[in-house]
Amino acid sequence: MIRKSSGLRTLESALYRSGLGPVAGVDEVGRGACAGPLVVAACVLGPGKLESLAALDDSKKLTESVRERLFPVIRRYALAYHVVFIPPAEVDRRGVHVANIEGMRRAVAGLSLRPGYVLSDGFRVPGLAVPSLPVIGGDAVAACIAAASVLAKVSRDRLMVAMDAEHPGYGFADHKGYSTPAHSAALARLGPCPQHRHSFINVRRVANGSGGRVVADCKPDLPLQRDEGR
């Protein structure tokens, strides 16, 4: 594992110069949310595209408007990308960490070209068919990780906005499933819906306090979101 470098994109560029490309970056969004899917993206950018995407950074540091502007640009410049959606039920069954690692494996496996090297943001990903390296602060070191972060974030945010219409009253479009005072108040008032993760203590407490019920006015779960990429 390496830590954030002072040189922007230096690691990814060095791998390409050493002939170890294509380099795939992989990152997740939604790990700490108590509702909604865990979304993982993998992305391969050609070495000639790195400067064209100089605005890339950790998706959480970018404004929503910048992320939305970068989203189609990344998909246009990417040699390959794949976005994986892991539903709440699978997160509950596997646990967040295991689901996260499994999502990273699926995202890399779903790429339309085989990478020569994989850079993951912070987590070691065992079981990959190619060499890999976890990078702390990887969004600032490798453009491919930053691109994966934006793909995952925008994909998840858009889904949470759609989920807000399917499950009104929780404010999913605003807090995106994370624990906020408004979300906690709605959860206490309405009880959990099928998009909540019962492995999270705040959801479990409410479910147990209401006899484990799922609120009657909560519509059925959204259709399974298909993975996407090229």
UniProtKB/Swiss-Prot annotation:
Positions contributing to a divalent metal cation binding: 27-28, 121
GO molecular function terms listed in the Swiss-Prot or TrEMBL record: manganese ion binding; RNA binding; RNA-DNA hybrid ribonuclease activity
Domain RNase H type-2, residue spans: 21-212
Cell location: Cytoplasm
Superkingdom of the source species: Bacteria
Matches recorded under InterPro entries: RNase_HII, RNase_HII/HIII, RNase_HII/HIII_dom, RNaseH-like_sf, RNaseH_sf
Alphabetized UniProt keyword annotations: Cytoplasm, Endonuclease, Hydrolase, Manganese, Metal-binding, Nuclease
GO BP: DNA replication, removal of RNA primer; mismatch repair
GO CC annotation: cytoplasm; ribonuclease H2 complex
Needed cofactors: Mn(2+); Mg(2+)
EC number of this enzyme: 3.1.26.4
Pfam families found in the cross-reference section: RNase_HII (PF01351)
Main location: cytoplasm
Reaction(s) this enzyme catalyzes, per UniProt: Endonucleolytic cleavage to 5'-phosphomonoester
Cofactor note: Manganese or magnesium. Binds 1 divalent metal ion per monomer in the absence of substrate. May bind a second metal ion after substrate binding.
Function: Endonuclease that specifically degrades the RNA of RNA-DNA hybrids.
PANTHER family: RIBONUCLEASE H2 SUBUNIT A (PTHR10954), RIBONUCLEASE HII (PTHR10954:SF18)
Membership in a protein family: Belongs to the RNase HII family.
Full protein name: Ribonuclease HII
Organism this protein belongs to: Mycobacterium avium (strain 104)
